[in-house]
Curated annotation (Swiss-Prot):
SMART domains: GuKc (SM00072). Belongs to the guanylate kinase family. Its main location: cytoplasm. This is Guanylate kinase. Essential for recycling GMP and indirectly, cGMP. ATP binds at residues 14-21. It comes from the Bacteria. It catalyses: GMP + ATP = GDP + ADP. GO terms for molecular function: ATP binding; guanylate kinase activity.
Amino acid sequence: MSAYRKGNIFIISAASGTGKTTLVSRLLANHNGLRVSVSHTTRPPREGEANGVHYHFVSKEEFESLIAQEAFLEYADVFGNYYGTGAEGVNALAAAGYDVILEIDVQGAAQVRDALPEAVGIFILPPSFDVLAARLNGRGTDSREVIQRRLSKARHEIEQSVLFDFVVVNDDLARAEEDLRHIVNACRLKRSRQLGFIADLLENS
């Protein structure tokens, strides 16, 4: 966290099964000054997921009440479940100088970029569709029909990667994490993100 600058907002998107969640977890564990935005969802928790840590798990009625209050930067219905990013928490973290990660889908990323043009978009690519299919099958949580739908959707999502600022291929977890760290560090060093430090330096010269 820096006392001199507003934090960056990083949008990290990927097709389902690309390893985005694992990469983000590793990045948060090994990189200081980063916070993740905890999304709201109406889907049931998976094994090992905790409310308020991985997601805010809410009912459909609660989610739709938040929509009516315009509480989300973005939200979407994904395979019958709502997902959304709360605006208040993201803005508070960035204002405090933290870099904020939004781990959201392509549709949500477009909504956030419209609302926050300064946000940095990063898209995670699988090394191949064969690897992606194997990862989805390996989860053991979805039917064959759902997996085929996810693969079909993945092709469309990967086509949308041209709208992002950076792409990272997750063929090796450690290397992909290192690529993400380089992106975060480079964005922190942008002149536009160091104006507070520069002004303070000149004032005290």
